[in-house]
Amino acid sequence: MKKNFLILIVIVVFILFSAFWSIVSEGYDKQNKSILFLKKIIPSSLAKKVRDKIFVIPNLKEKNRILNIQVKKYEQGYKGILFYDEKIKSTNKKFEANIKKFFLPFPRLDLNLGWNAEKNSKRAHYLEIVDDKIFVASGLGETIYFDKTNINNQELKQKKIFNNLENIFQKDNKIFFGIRDLFYENNYIYLSILESDEKGFTINIYRAKKDLKNLEFKLFFKSNEYSETGYNLQTGGRIEKFEKNKILFSIGFLDKYKSVQSKNSLAGKIISIDKDNLKQELVSIGHRNPQGLYFLKKKNLIINTEHGPQGGDEINFNFFSNSEIKNFGWPISSYGIPYPSQDKNFYEKNIFLKKSHSQYGFLEPIKY
C-alpha cells in the first residue's frame, strides 16, 4: 500500500515538475493555448528566477539546445544551403515548376509575432536579378550576391557586398526603419528606404552604381511626405521599370487621410520619376498601401496589389494614359472594414468606406 502511494506521489510530482517547466522554459510549445495563457499571466522576471534557481540543470540544457539551433541556423545561412526541392504541376497539368528554398545569412521571419509587424520588418529580404547575378538585400541593409547558376546546386555560395547603409540607418531605430524594395536597371541599384528625420518618418529612394565589392548609396529621390501619426506600416515603397527613361514608385498613404485624394500631395499615390531630371508625375491616386507593382509594356498596363483594411486587399488594373490620372478611391471607397482594435468613431469621422467604387467616380478593383 505504502509502495503504491509513494509511486503515485512520484508520478504526480514528475507531472507537476514537467508541467511547470514547460510554462517557465523558453522552449515551450507555441501552439499550446493553455501554456500560452499561463505564460502571459506569470511575470517573465518570476519565470526567469524559477528557471535559474529551481530548474538549474534543465535550464542549462534548454539554453544549450537553443544555442545549438542558432549555431546551426547561422551555419546553414552562411553557406546558403538548399533545404527544399520539389517539382509541382499547375492545376491544369500544363506547366511544371521546380520550387527550391535556400537558407540566407539574415535573421528569419518570426511567424509567432503575428501583428507585431514592425518587429518583422527587419527580417524581410529583397532580391533582384542583376545581369548574371542575383542580388539580395536584408531589411537592415546587408547585401550579398551569388551566381544565378548556383540555384541548380546544393549551396548558393553567396558573397558579401560592403555598403554604406549603416551610415544611413544609424540615426534610426532599425526595428522600425529599413529597406522596402530593391530594383536594378542600367548598371544602377535602387533601394526604397523607410527612414526618419526631425519631421518624422518618410519613404525615399537611394541609388548606387553596381559594384560587387562596395555599394555607395546616395539619396536619389526624396518624397517629402511624412506620417502624421508615427504609424509606419502603410508606406508602399515599390519600384518598377516604366516607359522611356522612367521608373514607377508607389507611396503609401502614411496615415494622411485628408491628403490621399489631393493632387498636391504624394501620399497614397503611384508616381513616375524620370531618372535623368527627377521630374515626377502622378500616375494614380487614392491608394492605401500599394506594395505590389508591375508594368506590362505590351498592354500599357500597370498592375498593383493594394493592402486595404480588414478584407479590403485589392488587385488593381490601370491602363495607363497620359491624359488621365486614375483614382482608386481610398479612403472614401473600400471593400474592407476597420480592424477590431481601431477606433470606429475615428473611422466614421475620417474615412467613409463606401463599398462601391464606380458609384463615386473611382475605378473598381479587378479582385478584392
Task: Give, region by region, the residue ranges found by the protein language model.
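Conserved beta-propeller blade signature
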Residues: K133-A137, Y188-S192, K246-S250, L301-T305
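N-terminal Sec-pathway targeting helices
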Residues: M1-F14
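Beta-rich, blade/repeat-based domains predominating
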Residues: E118-D131, K171-N186, E228-K246, I285-L301, ...
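Asp-box/WD-like beta-propeller blade repeats and closely related beta-sheet repeat scaffolds
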Residues: F176-F177, K199-K241
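Beta-propeller domains
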Residues: K94-L104, D132-N167, L212-K213
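Beta-propeller fold detector
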Residues: K100, N152-I168, N214-N224, E281-S284, ...
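Structural motif
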Residues: E142-F146, E198-R207, A267, G311-F317
